[in-house]
Amino acid sequence: MGGKLIEAIQELKALSRGRVTSTPLPDDDFISEYESEVGFLFHEEYKYFLKHASNIFFGTKDPLVVTRDRTDRSELRNAIHEGREFGIPHDWLPICEDNGDYYCITPNGQIRFWSGNGVEKESWKDIATWVKEVWIAEG
């Protein structure tokens, strides 16, 4: 995994002072099962993010999570379904919901912002950049 993402997550963990949600972090087997269930192959950086940062409690961003019981209010499966109803492109995967808008990872690993008004111009080259410029900066 790229050092940039590892570094961004370490910074996020330090800033959160160890605060995490009660949602357990997924392992590789569960992520693979979840991918099959939702019909979407996750980008490798997103898998790493899920396993190491999806339960961090910091600032105002609330990343989407994958859970065994599928009932969390920030459940990825639900966001995929809702996002598709609102017009998110089918090859974009929501990673964070923000007041009805979504940050999504595209097939090339770029993060794009999608609002209820449609595709926005805001984008970040990868998850690490999004963590630093959005989650941490707006925290």
Model-derived features: where do they sit?
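Segments surrounding the PLD/"HKD" phosphodiesterase catalytic module and close analogs
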Residues: 101-129
